[in-house]
Amino acid sequence: MQAMQIRQLFPRLYSNKQPALANGIIETTLQPSFGNTKSITMETKPLPYLGEEDSGRTYYLIIAKDMSADKWLEQQSTVKKALNIGICDNEYIVRKFHQNYSPLSNVDHSPLHQSIFDFLDPNEHEMIKTQLSTASTESNSCDIVVRTISFEDISGLEMRATICPIFDGFGAIQEYAFSVWDLKEANDSGQPGMKLKIWMAKRDISTSQLSLSTGISIQTISKLRNGKITKPQRLTAELIASELRVEITDIWPEVGRR
C-alpha cells in the first residue's frame, strides 16, 4: 500500500508538519463499510525498494488489529470493576480472559484457548446461544445469567454477566466481549470455605488484605478458605463477616446460630 492511499484511509494520521507515515505501532480509527467507527492499532513497516519503476514511492506493510472488544471492556470498567472479563471469537473459543480476584481453586480452571461452552452447564447451551443470536441481530449488548459446570474442587457457580457482540467491517460476528459482575454458588454446597472465597472475590479483597484489616493471621484465613477449618471461633467469624459486609450465617450458618 502506498503512502498516498494510507493518507486517504487514515487522514487523522497526517498533518502538514508530518507528511510521512511514522513507523511502529499507533492507535487510530477506521470507518468500515458496516457499523460504527472502529478503534484499531496499526503497525506500519516500510517495504524495501522494489525497482526503478517505483522510484520516489514508499510502500508499507500494514498490520491492523481491531480493538473494539478491548475498548468496550475498558468502557465497562469505568462503570464498575468486573469480577471477570474476556473475549471469545465467533466459534466461542476464549481468546482473552482475566480474573480480578484470588483464584477459587489451587487448580487452573482458566477457559483460555478453550470453548466457553466447555465450562457452562450443558442444559443451558441452547438458551445461551439463543440469547447471543438475539443480541447479534439487534446489535446490542445483553445481560445474561449462566451456570458453570462443577469441578472436583469447585461447585457449580451462577454468574451474572453482560455480553457484547463485536462485528467485523462486513457485518458478520467477529467476537464477543463479556464482563462478569456477580457470582454465587448455583446450589448450596454446604462448604463454608467456598462461600468465603466467593464473598472475598465479590468484595475484591485478598487474603493478605483481610488479614491486615481483621488482625487474623494469613494462615488461619487460608485454612478457612481451603476448608481445613470449617467452624471458626465466633469472634473470628464476626470479624471476617463484618469486613466482608455480610451476615455470619451467609458463610458459617452453624456459627451464626446462638
Predicted segment positions?
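DNA major-groove recognition helix of helix-turn-helix/homeodomain DNA-binding modules
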Residues: 235-250
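Terminal output helix/cap of sensory domains in signal transduction proteins
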Residues: 2-36, 120-150
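PAS/PAS-like sensory domain cap-loop motif
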Residues: 1, 100-112, 246
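Short loop/turn elements at sensory-signaling interfaces that couple input to output
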Residues: 42-60, 161-176
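Sensory modules in modular signal-transduction proteins
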Residues: 68-104
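A short, Lys/Arg-rich alpha-helix, primarily the initiator
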Residues: 181-205
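Recognition helix of helix-turn-helix/homeodomain-like DNA-binding domains
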Residues: 216-231
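PAS-associated C-terminal cap
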Residues: 65-72, 182-186
